[in-house]
C-alpha cells in the first residue's frame, strides 16, 4: 500500500541515510532477500536495493499489488548467483564475480512505490523506498551471451507489435554486478547463492495492461509470454 512521505524529522538527508533507512525496512519486514537491483553510482545517486524473495516470480501469470489497473515494468537482464561472494577484506575481481554467476536470464522488474507521489522527492528518499522495486519476473535463460544493445519487441494481445532499440544504461551489462559485489562486500553483506541481480533497464519503463497476454522478444536472446493480474484485496 502507498502512503505519504516520512515525517520531516525522519526523512533521509543524504545517500547514507537513505541506505540505512532501506536496510532498517528490510530488517523490520524480515523477508528473505532474493536478489538485488543495482546500477553504477553517479553524482548524488546510489542505485542499490533489495528484491524480496516473495516478490520474485517465474510463473506465466503474475500477480501485482491489489487495486491497480496496469503494471509498470522495466526490461532487464538478470544474473542468478550460483556461488556465495561473502564479505571479505579483499576486493572481488571481475573474473571471480563471473565465476559465481550460474545463469543469465531475461527479466522484467516490476515497479511501484510506497509513496503516494514521487513528484519532487529527493533521491535519498527514493533510495530509502527501495528505488520503486516491487518485484521481479525471472524469465528464460538467454540463448547467447548478453549484449549491451538489441532490438526489443513486445506485443500486447490484440494490438500491433511495438519495437525499441534497447540499450543498457551503463553500456556493459555486468558492470553494475561487479560494483554491487564489492559494495555489499564492504558493507559486510555479500551476495549469496540463489540470489538474482538486475543491473538496469534496457528500455525505460513500459506500462502494460492487466488480464492481457504480452509477448516479448529480446532480439532473439530470449522470447517469452506472460500476463499480469491484480491480487485480491486482503
Regions found by a protein language model. Give the residues of each.
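Catalytic-core "active-site belt" of small-molecule-metabolizing enzymes
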Residues: 1-172, 177, 186, 207-209, ...
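Short strand-turn-strand beta-turns centered on an Asx-Gly dipeptide
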Residues: 156-158, 199, 219
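Carbohydrate-binding surfaces in secreted/extracellular proteins
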Residues: 216
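Non-transmembrane, aqueous-exposed alpha-helical and coiled segments at domain scale
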Residues: 233-234
Amino acid at each position: 500500500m502507498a502512503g505519504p512521505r516520512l515525517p520531516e524529522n525522519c526523512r533521509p538527508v543524504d545517500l547514507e541515510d537513505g541506505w540505512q533507512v532501506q536496510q532498517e525496512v528490510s530488517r523490520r519486514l524480515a523477508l528473505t532477500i532474493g536478489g538485488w537491483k543495482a546500477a553504477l553510482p553517479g553524482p548524488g545517486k546510489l542505485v542499490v536495493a533489495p528484491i524480496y524473495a516473495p516478490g520474485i516470480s517465474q510463473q506465466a501469470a503474475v500477480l501485482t499489488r491489489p487495486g491497480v489497473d496496469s503494471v509498470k515494468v522495466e526490461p532487464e537482464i538478470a544474473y542468478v548467483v550460483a556461488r556465495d561472494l561473502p564479505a571479505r577484506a579483499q576486493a572481488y575481481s571481475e573474473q571471480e564475480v563471473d565465476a559465481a554467476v550460474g545463469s543469465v536470464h531475461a527479466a522484467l522488474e516490476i515497479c511501484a512505490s510506497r509513496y503516494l507521489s514521487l513528484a519532487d522527492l529527493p533521491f535519498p528518499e527514493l533510495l530509502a523506498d527501495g528505488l520503486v522495486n516491487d518485484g521481479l519476473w525471472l524469465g528464460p535463460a538467454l540463448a547467447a551471451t548478453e549484449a549491451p544493445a538489441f532490438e526489443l519487441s513486445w506485443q500486447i494481445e490484440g494490438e500491433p507489435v511495438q519495437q525499441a532499440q534497447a540499450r543498457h544504461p551503463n553500456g556493459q551489462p555486468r558492470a553494475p554486478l561487479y560494483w554491487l559485489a564489492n559494495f555489499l562486500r564492504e558493507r559486510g553483506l555479500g551476495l549469496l547463492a540463489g540470489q538474482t541481480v538486475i543491473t538496469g533497464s534496457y528500455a525505460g519503463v513500459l506500462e502494460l495492461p492487466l488480464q492481457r497476454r504480452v509477448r516479448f522478444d529480446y532480439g532473439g536472446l530470449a522470447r517469452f509470454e506472460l500476463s499480469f493480474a491484480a491480487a485480491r484485496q486482503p
